[in-house]
Amino acid sequence: GEDNVPLGSPATSDLSDTSCAKTHEALKTSRNTDQHYPAPKKAEDQEFGSAANIIVDPKLFQKRRFQSPRVLFSTQPPPLSRDEQSVEFLDNADSLNRNIRAKRGTHPVHNQGEYSVCDSVSVWVANKTTATDIRGNLVTVMVDINLNNNVYKQYFFETKCRNPNPVPSGCRGIDARHWNSYCTTTHTYVRALTKEGNQASWRFIRIDTACVCVISRITENFG
């Protein structure tokens, strides 16, 4: 298909200015102003034969369809604010410019007297090698890519339940006299860079994205 490009295709430098700008915008790296982060890793610094030595054509990144803020290509680990525990995405000029809170408390308090029904934890997943695609097939996810002689890692921001039963009766705040309840992780599909044979391509893969409460009414037995 049009989104498939051989993994051996050279990362050419003769692209138009517009194409280069789009590629740069799509893969802008997260950098810290205090310069504590190292410089981008060069492909030649990687071990021979590693996945990072697979060269990906920049043309793959010219199409911006269906991009999710939960997928990040970066030479640096995504920053996590220690104070507010917020996760920052790429500072792009489009919908990627946003924050997602990483709820890490045992039972996070939103406002005084307000609690979450379920407890969730959000993390950046850096080494996802396989995933289920939208057709139900197991596919190989590219962890590292070589683009213009820089090594980028593909990160996924995933949210899942910390515990299926935050309280002994199930979900927090549910009337256990009338309802059975439990917390469960739900999923969505995001566009990720995968490989099949010698082809790199975009596929929709399933990742964890939320923790929700499932309830069912207790049926009374009248004998």
Swiss-Prot record:
Source organism, top-level taxon: Eukaryota
Tissue: Expressed by the venom gland.
Prodomain positions: 1-104
Keyword Cytoplasm part of the UniProt annotation: no
Region feature Disordered, mapped onto this chain: 1-45
Alphabetical list of Pfam families matching this protein: NGF
Subcellular localization(s) per the UniProt record: Secreted
Disulfide bonding pattern of the chain: 118-183, 161-211, 171-213
Gene Ontology biological process terms in this record: cell surface receptor protein tyrosine kinase signaling pathway; modulation of chemical synaptic transmission; negative regulation of neuron apoptotic process; nerve development; nerve growth factor signaling pathway; neuron projection morphogenesis
Polar residues composition-biased segments: 10-21
GO CC field: axon; dendrite; extracellular space; synaptic vesicle
Keywords, in A-Z order: Cleavage on pair of basic residues, Disulfide bond, Glycoprotein, Growth factor, Lipid-binding, Metalloenzyme inhibitor, Metalloprotease inhibitor, Protease inhibitor, Secreted, Toxin
Main location: secreted
Biased composition (Basic and acidic residues): 22-34
Keyword hit for Glycoprotein: yes
GO molecular function, one term: toxin activity
Record InterPro entries: Cystine-knot_cytokine, Nerve_growth_factor-like, Nerve_growth_factor-rel, Nerve_growth_factor_bsu, Nerve_growth_factor_CS, Venom_nerve_growth_factor
Glycan-linked positions: 127
Subunit structure: Homodimer; non-covalently linked.
Protein family according to the UniProt entry: Belongs to the NGF-beta family.
Function (record text): Nerve growth factor is important for the development and maintenance of the sympathetic and sensory nervous systems. It stimulates division and differentiation of sympathetic and embryonic sensory neurons as well as basal forebrain cholinergic neurons in the brain. Its relevance in the snake venom is not clear. However, it has been shown to inhibit metalloproteinase-dependent proteolysis of platelet glycoprotein Ib alpha, suggesting a metalloproteinase inhibition to prevent metalloprotease autodigestion and/or protection against prey proteases.
Protein name: Venom nerve growth factor 1
Organism: Azemiops feae
